[in-house]
């Protein structure tokens, strides 16, 4: 006895894995038409239904777009196109309308994504939380995907991102701190990582932290310790390293109202103060010592930092040590005397 069920063929397009065969068409009394024939595969200037649906599973918005294109470029009916796309006719005809609150949230999300082009949806959610405290990360992710804001992965050489940052001279202590990382190795070839922080105005070394690994949260703790003695800066200047673009570091700058100046990738001259300091640090300290342990490296580097701040003359400070330069500035400001000459070009 011949079964009346249609034959199944594996590997078919997005139709549930089956398509009618010649025998099935003869049994049902209808003509034999495959999906390709119905969609007009052989017609010049037309794409098949498979062409509109090939690839990964589409979101509802993309499915509506695919259905519209099939209706425009193929002889498929609306019912057939919706069935191929896996979307009901009601969902195709009646797209959801976002509420005014969702529209405002989406507009703000797009604005932040355009400002911070390398931030993902979780970091953007951190920025949006103060303005939209009741919105969770799942809704942010949905709006993030709908707006096609996904950050592209860089496969090759880095390209400049963002606008060029002009390097401005600071006018007072704690106006801007510049920071960066310097790497070296112990005698056993184990790597050490040094966080260097410099006050752009006084040229003082605010801190040099030495460890095998320094994360964004570690950087925040070190800066809080330095601020206990010096106070917090108005702004910090960094590169686009993961430690300085981490959620912990961004939250720290927002908590204390600190401006975060990010330089362009591959443009170290935009962070010239810390690059100059790092050159002196490597030439006068790291290249002159062979560290056998992390403890020794910390002791030697701490001694060099004290010598740099208190004894070593600095040309940008008028040939006096940075600590003396800072003390002279505070004295002049306290006495309210003649305007202080920073001596940057003496």
From Swiss-Prot:
Skewed-composition ranges (Basic and acidic residues): 29-39
Integrase catalytic domain span: 169-329
Disordered as annotated region, ranges: 1-50
MF (Gene Ontology): nucleic acid binding
Keyword entries, A-Z: Transposable element
Gene3D superfamilies to which the protein is assigned, alphabetical: Ribonuclease H-like superfamily/Ribonuclease H (3.30.420.10)
A GO biological-process term: DNA integration
PROSITE patterns: INTEGRASE
Keyword Manganese in record: no
Name of one Pfam family that matches: HTH_21
Domain of life: Bacteria
PANTHER family reported in the protein's UniProt record: BLR2054 PROTEIN, LOW CALCIUM RESPONSE LOCUS PROTEIN T
Protein name: Insertion element IS476 uncharacterized 39.2 kDa protein
Organism per entry: Xanthomonas euvesicatoria
């Amino acid at each position: 006895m011949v079964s009346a069920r249609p034959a199944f063929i594996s590997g078919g397009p997005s139709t549930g894995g089956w398509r009618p065969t010649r025998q099935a068409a003869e049994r049902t009394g209808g003509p034999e038409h495959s999906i390709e024939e119905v969609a007009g595969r052989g017609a010049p200037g037309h794409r098949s239904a498979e062409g509109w649906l090939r690839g990964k599973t589409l979101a509802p918005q993309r499915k509506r777009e695919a259905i519209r294109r099939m209706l425009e470029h193929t002889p498929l009916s609306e019912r057939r196109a919706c069935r191929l796309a896996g979307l009901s006719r009601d969902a195709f005809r009646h797209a959801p309308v976002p509420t005014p609150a969702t529209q405002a949230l989406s507009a703000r999300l797009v604005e932040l994504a355009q400002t911070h082009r390398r931030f993902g949806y979780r970091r953007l959610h951190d920025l949006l939380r103060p303005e939209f405290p009741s919105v969770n990360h799942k809704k942010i992710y949905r709006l993030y995907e709908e707006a096609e804001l996904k950050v592209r992965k860089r496969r090759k050489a880095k390209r400049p991102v963002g606008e060029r940052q002009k390097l401005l001279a600071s006018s007072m202590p704690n106006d801007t701190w510049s920071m960066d990382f310097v790497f070296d190795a112990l005698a056993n070839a184990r790597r050490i990582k040094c966080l260097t922080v410099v006050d752009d105005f006084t040229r003082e070394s605010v801190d040099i932290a030495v460890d095998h690994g320094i994360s964004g949260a570690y950087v925040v703790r070190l800066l809080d310790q330095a601020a206990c003695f010096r106070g917090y800066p108005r702004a910090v200047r960094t590169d686009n390293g993961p430690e300085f673009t981490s959620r912990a570091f961004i939250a720290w700058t927002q908590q204390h109202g600190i401006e975060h100046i990010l330089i362009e990738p591959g443009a170290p001259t935009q962070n010239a103060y810390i690059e100059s300091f790092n050159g002196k640090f490597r030439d006068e300290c790291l290249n002159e010592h062979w560290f056998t342990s992390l403890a020794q490296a910390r002791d030697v580097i701490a001694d060099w930092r004290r010598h740099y701040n208190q004894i070593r003359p600095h040309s940008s400070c008028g040939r006096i040590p940075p600590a003396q330069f800072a003390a002279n500035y505070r004295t002049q400001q306290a006495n309210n005397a003649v305007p202080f000459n920073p001596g940057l070009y003496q």
